[in-house]
Amino acid sequence: MTRINSCPAARVRSDSRLVRCDRREFLRFGLLPVAGLPWLPVGLAPAAETPAALVPLNRFPRMVQEFFVQQVRLAEQRSLAAKGSLKTKVDAEAYVRGVREKIRACFGPEPERTPLNPRITGVIERDAYRIEKVIFESRPGFPVTANLYLPKTDKLPVPGVIGTCGHSTNGKAEKAYQSFAQGLARLGYACLIYDPIGQGERLQYVTENLKSRIGPGVAEHLHAGNQQFLVGEFLGMWRAWDGIRALDYLLTRPEVDKHRVGVTGNSGGGTMTTWLSGVEQRWTMAAPSCFVTTFRRNLENELPADTEQCPPRALALGLDHDDFLAALAPKPIIVLGKERDYFDARGVEEAYARLQRLYRLLEAPDKVGLFIGPTEHGFTQENREAMYRWFNQAAGLPPVTGEPPLVIEKDETLQCTPKGQVAATGAKTVFQFTREKSQQLTARRGTVGGDALRRAVVEVLKLPARHGVPDYRILRYLARRRFPLPHAVAYAVETEPGIQALVYRLFPGPWYARPPRGASRAVLYVAHLSSDAELREEPLIGEIVQAEPASAVFACDVRGIGESQPDTCGVNSFHAAYGSDFFYAIHSLMLDRPYLGQKTFDVLRVLDWLADLGHREIHLVARGWGALAGTFAALLCEPVKQVTLKHALTSYAAVAESEDYAWPLAILLPNVLARFDLPDCYRELQAKRLRQIEPWGPMAGKEA
């Protein structure tokens, strides 16, 4: 991926000045506020604590990472077993058909093919080629800005290529991307390269001076893409659809040979080349650069990827990066990587080996290739030349000896719009489409309640069946933590293999052993971020302890917060939009187990454990993030007789219909608004004496 904006280490200071970072800096510093806003305070080290300060406990910071590694390894093993079972050409052909069906399941149905309404807003004449400034609509009112590089030749029609961009701020005008488009034109190709959503001339969240107020590229993708999940949309499909419609336009041009069309791109463009190979069969050749590896390598290396780079259900369906290219088999494909890339070259070689075996079975071993350049991430000259050689061979053109001399244009020269942004022309944004769909789903859904609501909750959260009573560990006695009661014991309740919910039991006197039986009523507090910290700092807990002196009092950290808050993906990255909490939330969607569903399952298993201890009546109290898991668990668990929620989200529709929101992906549920919304749950919980305290709207308490 190319640099978006400068963020060198030399600029990092201990004051509060703010900088913008590209994906490389995202990975180095692991920072972006969870609200999706682009500005980062550089001085992020916590202030020195007074001797009396207590640091929140976190004794299991690797638990979530190792759990996901295990889950993804199992998915990979199943996928490799399926690939290993292929023995004949017929087997391989059936496999290719199967992956195409699975990819369609991931990406969802294609939208309607509406008129492109193309227009050419300018032409740039150069020595051996010309550049046409093209705008077309991939969806009604949703313009795509593109440059069409056309060779000056009498040998028509020429092969065509769709060029996809990585996460460059200036999109199609980025030097490396101009270079491959111009290089192809000088070699006799027509190349249409277009701006991705949130980049170049297609910023989605603009200020009055037409700059991104969230941050171009990664930040805009995350902010729009996470929100889209609520209405059953996937940003990867939106970006792929732009590419499909770009191909539709390219094939209307008489200069282009419809039987010789390729697709290439680097980094985020390598992603789109890979996805487009999976969802579109008209390509005759493809060359993804600096993206293809394996999902397992990315996870084990703690490498976050954008929303659009993580297809929903992909891992659950047995798909890996190579499968999206296998969908195009046996057409010519070359996988381009880099030895010094953060996309692991070992995974590049593994993906290629899987494709190589498939192509051998398809009797086309020479139609798949591999090139790993010696340098770092980027569509540098060596990778571009490998792409040229491959495409010339596939298109029946003479061998390439090297890249022709290039002349790089200024960004402004390549702009298609008068002011350099489609926003200035009144274009619709991704958010506006999301808001409209949310409103449509709400009107269509109506009110949901009773057993229908409970079934919908189980199905949307993908909650597995619960069996038996969970085992637990008794951890070291907690002394002097300043809880509402003077003593506490922590129990690690095993909610599923590899996962423990950390549960504190408060006591008036010393206790070191298993929980006592006796009290029929218990209070269970489900924490927002840390039970340890909130038992000291949240006044609601103290109030309830005083109000219910006869009740046993427990507090719970579900997976991924408090005692198991991950320390992965960079220092202090947990709350970053590209950090560890997002990392596991997006992998959860690929595994088809929403992260909030897993957290809800933890609460349900803790409730099973409490029931086994003799607590037949539960007052469930929850705050913030924990209020969502608490809501669903209370809805599904009969022993919960009373519910108190503080800072619970008002509704998912409010998030879907607000351009600015601060709730993380871990709290958002895929396609939830097609089935129910939180007010349905709150209405149902009135029968359990629901008390709501200071509900939070889309900005999670950060409203101005």
Regions found by a protein language model. Name each.
Residues 48-144, 329, 336-502, 506-521, ...:
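Alpha/beta-hydrolase-fold serine-hydrolase catalytic core, especially in secreted/extracellular enzymes
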Residues 158-159, 187-189, 258-260, 281-284, ...:
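Loop/turn elements at helix/coil->beta-strand transitions in domains of secreted/extracellular proteins
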Residues 248-314, 606-674:
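Primarily recognizes the serine-hydrolase "nucleophile elbow" in alpha/beta-hydrolase
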